[in-house]
Amino acid sequence: MRSPLQSCSASEGRAVEAALSVDHAGGRSVLRRQNVGYPLHVTRGFHLDAARPDLLTLYLQSASGGLYAGDRIALDVSVARDAAFHLTTQAATVVHDGRGIGALQRQTITVDSGAFCAITTDPYVLFPGAELALDTVATVADDAVLCVADGFAVHDPRASGRAFSEFSGRLRVLRPDGHLLLHDAGRVSGDELHGALGPFAAAANLIIVAPPDRLPSVKSLQQAADGCGALAGASRAPNDAGLVLRILAPDGGTLSRATDAAFHVAAAAALGVTLSRRRK
């Protein structure tokens, strides 16, 4: 769901809504509809992969400095039948002091039959006092593929000794008939961080929902992340939904590289080709 959205500072935060709709037309995936307002900005679409010219890659950018207390962000992504779409971010998102009210980001994702959708965000950088909740609901057709990656890294720029407040995430994946396929949820507070993560200061999840013949092996996912200096563990998702990869890293940079490497393994299995690196 590392966020594609960032909002400006305000005394009570701000509410921001964005919607992206991707269709398949003329042998390519195209951005058919967008509703994105300040402080968000959508780059032009890129078709970066010669072996998969139908795959549309899009970067969401922001004119602001991160997520602030009281921010309420909503993103709606719809990927139509047979379309292929990768949404990513230009850089990590700073999460500022939540001042007791925190920030909330909601994502609603729809992936139609035969479609591929990947939403991979750079880590959320949690400053002292930061509080962020992520809530994603995805509806995925039986023969479609969804990859969602998000995570966080801790940073205390002034060496104040204060911990972040809380980071929580929830992902629910449903079939078009409403059947709940997967429910993944977690929460960690700054005071609990070392007990939960040990010596690590960054963590991420990569969740892949796909038919069995379009999944990578558990070993290949783990090796891709471990090879970047992270510690990773993968397992089968409930209800034969796909795979879940957990990644721990010493810092945000290592986490980004490990998550990206694992995503490329997942994408190669799902699409049948090796994707080019997304420059940032």
Curated annotation (Swiss-Prot):
GO molecular function, one term: nickel cation binding
GN (gene name): ureD3
Record's protein name: Urease accessory protein UreD 3
Alphabetic keyword roster: Chaperone, Cytoplasm, Nickel insertion
Quaternary structure, from the entry: UreD, UreF and UreG form a complex that acts as a GTP-hydrolysis-dependent molecular chaperone, activating the urease apoprotein by helping to assemble the nickel containing metallocenter of UreC. The UreE protein probably delivers the nickel.
Similarity annotation: Belongs to the UreD family.
Primary subcellular site in the record, as a coarse category: cytoplasm
A GO CC term attached to the entry: cytoplasm
Function: Required for maturation of urease via the functional incorporation of the urease nickel metallocenter.
